[in-house]
Curated annotation (Swiss-Prot):
SUPFAM superfamilies: P-loop containing nucleoside triphosphate hydrolases, TrpR-like
This protein's GO CC annotations: cytoplasm; plasma membrane
Broad class of the protein's primary localization: cytoplasm
Gene: dnaA
GO biological process, any: DNA replication initiation
Chain positions covered by the region annotation Domain II: 74-173
Biological function: Plays an essential role in the initiation and regulation of chromosomal replication. ATP-DnaA binds to the origin of replication (oriC) to initiate formation of the DNA replication initiation complex once per cell cycle. Binds the DnaA box (a 9 base pair repeat at the origin) and separates the double-stranded (ds)DNA. Forms a right-handed helical filament on oriC DNA; dsDNA binds to the exterior of the filament while single-stranded (ss)DNA is stabiized in the filament's interior.
Name under which the protein is recorded: Chromosomal replication initiator protein DnaA
Pfam families reported in the protein's UniProt record: Bac_DnaA, Bac_DnaA_C, DnaA_N
Keyword Cytoplasm: yes
Chain spans, region Domain III, AAA+ region: 174-390
Subcellular location: Cytoplasm
Length: 510
C-alpha cells in the first residue's frame, strides 16, 4: 500500500526545495488522501484557499506528481480541492488553542506548521459537544471568554486602552478592487516584486516582513500592494487591512497631536493584520511622524502582522529619515520594480485595450510600446489617446492613426532624448570626458560608464545596435549588445546600479 506515500514525498521535497518555499507552500498542507486508481495512484490534497490552490498547482503540481510517481513506482495524479470555509476556521482555532491555554496572547497569524497540523482534523471533525474548538475571544461552551482587565478575566494591565477592531468594510474602502493580481501584467520588470507579494498573500506575517518595494513613478507599485490587500481580504474577509498614502499617516499624526489623542492613533494602526503604505519617502524631515511610525512598525511586527511599503528609492537612499527606521525597512526583503521592457509594454497595451473593449492590433501595440518607454502610467495615457482618437474620428486603429494621435508626445520625446544627450549626461554623471565615449580606452572607470550609455541608448532611443555602435566610436553591434545585456542583467541584482540608472533616466526625460 501507499499509505505513507505523501509523508515520503514531503521528505523528498523538503530536501530538494528551498527551505522557505517548502515551509510556506508544502509543509502546511494536511495529510493527503491516497487511493489506488486503476494502474496508478490518486493523491488528493485539500487546500485552505483558492490562491494557494492555484499557486501550488501552477508552481509545484508537476514536481509533486513526478516525485510521488518515482516513489510509488507507478503514475500518480494529483487532485487539489478547497477545504470548506468552516474547516479552515476550525483549523486556525485549533492551531491557536495551545497558545491560548498557555496564557499567551493569540497571534493574528499562526505558523504554517500549526495550521497544517490542524487542517486535517478540522476538516473531518464531527459536530458533537466533544469536538467544539474554543475560538479566540470565546470558550468551548459558546460563552464569550472574559477579556484582560475584566472581572474574572486574566490578570493584565486594565488601564491600557483596548484597541478597537478596525472594520473590514473600512479597510476595503481604501483598497481599489480593480487593482488585483489578475489585472497586473507580469513581466521581467516586476517579476521579483510580484513573486514576493504572492508569497506574502500565501503566508502573511511569515515571509518577507517587511516587504519594501521601490521604483520610479507609474511603474505599478501601488497596483501591486492593492493586489496583496485585495487577495488577503478575499481569502480572509475578517482580516484587518489598511491601505494609505504616507501623507495620510502624516495627517493622522498631526490631527492626533493637536487633539492629544495618541491612544486613538495607536489603536488604529497597532491593531492591523496588514498595513500597506505608499511613498514612505514623504516621511523625510518629519520627526514626530517617524517616531509614531516606528512605534506602529514595532507593534505590528511583534504581533506578526505584515507591513508592505513603497518608495521611489531603496531604504539606504532615503534622505532625512531616521536610521533606525531605514535599517528596519531593509531588514525584510527589498525589491525593485523596473520600467517595463518592450514585450511587457506590448502585453500591457493589449490587456488594457481589451479591458476598454477595443482590441489594439499587435503591430500598433508594438509601435506605441517602442515610443512610450517611461512607465505604465504614461503607457496607459497613450493608449487612452489612441482609443479616443479612433472613436472620435471613426477610424480603425492603425499605426498611422496612433502616430497622429500621439504626435505631440512623439515630438517631445524625439526632441529630448538622443544618443548625444545620453552620452553627455552619463559622462557628466560619472565625471569623465565625452570624448571617452568614443575612445578605445578600456579602464573600468571609462568602460563602465560607456556600457551604461550604450544600454540607455538602446532603451531610450529608436536607434539600432549598429547605429548605436557607430555613434560610440564605430564599435561593432556585438559590443553594444554585450553592454546592453551586461548592464540589463546587473540592474536586476545591483541595487546601487539600479538607482544610478533611475537617476539618469529621470534626468534624460527632463
Amino acid at each position: 500500500m501507499h499509505t505513507d506515500l505523501w509523508e515520503r514525498g514531503c521528505e523528498r521535497l523538503a530536501a530538494e526545495l528551498p527551505e522557505q518555499q517548502f515551509n510556506t507552500w508544502i509543509r502546511p498542507l494536511p495529510p493527503a488522501d491516497v487511493t489506488l486508481a486503476g494502474d496508478g495512484v490518486l493523491v488528493g490534497l485539500r487546500v485552505p484557499n483558492r490562491f494557494k490552490l492555484d499557486w501550488i498547482r501552477a508552481q509545484y503540481g508537476s514536481r509533486i506528481e513526478a516525485t510521488l510517481s518515482e516513489l510509488a513506482g507507478k503514475p500518480v495524479r494529483l487532485e487539489l480541492s478547497l477545504l470548506p470555509r468552516d474547516a479552515v476556521a476550525r483549523a486556525q482555532g485549533m492551531a491557536a488553542a495551545p497558545a491560548a491555554q498557555a496564557g499567551a496572547a493569540p497571534q493574528p497569524t499562526q505558523s504554517p506548521m500549526a495550521i497544517g497540523a490542524a487542517l486535517h482534523a478540522a476538516a473531518t471533525a464531527r459536530h458533537d459537544p466533544q469536538s467544539v474548538v474554543p475560538t479566540p475571544g470565546g470558550s468551548a461552551n459558546g460563552r464569550a471568554a472574559p477579556r484582560v482587565g475584566e472581572p474574572g478575566g486574566p490578570v493584565g494591565t486594565s488601564t491600557l486602552p483596548v484597541a478597537p477592531t478596525l472594520s473590514p468594510a473600512v479597510s476595503r474602502g481604501r483598497l481599489n478592487p480593480a487593482l488585483t493580481f489578475d489585472t497586473l501584467v507580469p513581466g521581467r520588470a516586476n517579476q521579483m516584486a510580484r513573486t514576493a507579494a504572492l508569497h506574502v498573500v500565501g503566508a502573511p506575517g511569515h515571509m518577507y516582513n517587511p516587504l519594501f518595494i521601490y521604483g520610479g513613478v507609474g511603474l505599478g507599485k501601488t497596483h501591486l500592494i492593492h493586489a496583496v490587500g485585495n487577495a488577503l481580504i478575499r481569502d480572509n474577509p475578517d482580516a484587518r487591512v489598511l491601505y494609505l498614502h504616507a501623507e495620510q499617516f502624516i495627517s493622522d499624526v498631526v490631527r492626533n497631536y493637536q487633539r492629544k489623542t495618541f491612544d486613538e492613533l495607536k489603536a488604529k494602526y497597532h491593531s492591523l493584520d496588514l498595513l500597506l503604505i505608499d511613498d514612505v519617502q514623504f516621511f523625510a524631515g518629519k520627526d514626530r511622524t517617524q517616531e509614531e511610525f516606528f512605534n506602529a512598525f514595532e507593534a505590528l511586527l511583534a504581533k506578526r502582522a505584515h507591513i508592505i511599503m513603497t518608495s521611489d528609492t531603496y531604504p539606504k537612499g532615503l534622505v532625512d529619515i531616521d536610521e533606525r527606521l531605514t535599517s528596519r525597512f531593509d531588514a525584510g526583503l527589498t525589491v525593485a520594480i523596473e520600467p517595463p521592457e518592450l514585450e511587457m509594454r506590448v502585453a500591457i497595451l493589449m490587456k488594457k485595450s481589451d479591458a476598454e473593449g477595443s482590441r489594439m492590433p499587435e503591430d500598433v501595440a508594438f509601435f506605441v510600446a517602442k515610443n512610450v518607454r517611461a512607465n505604465v502610467r504614461e503607457l496607459e495615457g497613450a493608449l487612452r489617446k489612441v482609443l479616443a482618437y479612433s472613436r472620435f474620428s471613426h477610424k480603425e486603429i492603425s499605426i498611422n492613426l496612433a502616430r497622429e494621435a500621439l504626435k505631440d508626445l512623439l515630438s517631445i520625446q524625439n526632441r529630448q532624448v538622443s544618443v548625444e544627450n545620453i552620452q553627455k549626461t552619463v559622462a557628466d554623471f560619472y565625471k569623465i570626458k565625452i570624448a571617452d565615449m568614443y575612445s578605445k580606452k578600456r579602464p573600468a572607470s571609462i568602460a563602465r560608464p560607456r556600457q551604461i550609455a550604450m544600454y540607455l541608448a538602446k532603451e531610450m532611443t529608436q536607434k539600432s545596435l549598429p547605429e548605436i555602435g557607430e555613434l560610440f566610436g564605430g564599435r561593432d553591434h556585438t559590443t553594444v549588445l554585450h553592454a546592453v545585456r551586461k548592464i540589463g542583467g546587473e540592474r536586476q541584482k545591483n541595487t546601487e546600479l539600479n538607482q544610478q540608472l533611475h537617476v539618469l533616466e529621470q534626468t534624460l526625460k527632463g
